[in-house]
Amino acid sequence: NNNYEAALGIVDSMEENDRNSITLLIWMLTRDCNALNALKMGKQNLKEFGIWDNQIDLYQKMGNRLTKHRITEVTNVLDDADKKVKGVLPGNSWLTAREAVKLLSV
């Protein structure tokens, strides 16, 4: 899927150019999941998530494509990535973040 390839390219670039940007990536993806959950619960104003009205259509399309279960699954994967950054869990946080991107893209 082209969206997945493009997203993966961005993640690869972030890792290559600034390995410390993993925390920003995790934060952004978690924010997106929280916004998608808010949309699923009927909320239309996502400004509290830093998402403006001109971006709502994109989030609605994602929300229509993703189930609540999938969004929860992605949130859990992102939590694991965060724990790997902090050393609470062993493993590569970048690989785990890529897993979250894949789950959001399918």
What do these predicted regions represent?
Residues 28, 73, 77-80, 100-103:
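Charged, amphipathic alpha-helical oligomerization/scaffolding segments
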Residues 57-59, 75-86:
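Short helix/strand-capping connector loops at secondary-structure junctions
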Residues 94-106:
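Acidic, carboxylate-rich catalytic segments that either coordinate divalent cations
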Residues 1-73:
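Small-residue-rich helix-loop
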Residues 3, 71, 77, 93-96:
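Generic hydrophobic secondary-structure packing signal
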Residues 33, 37-40, 82-86, 105:
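A structural signal for well-ordered alpha-helices, especially hydrophobic packing surfaces
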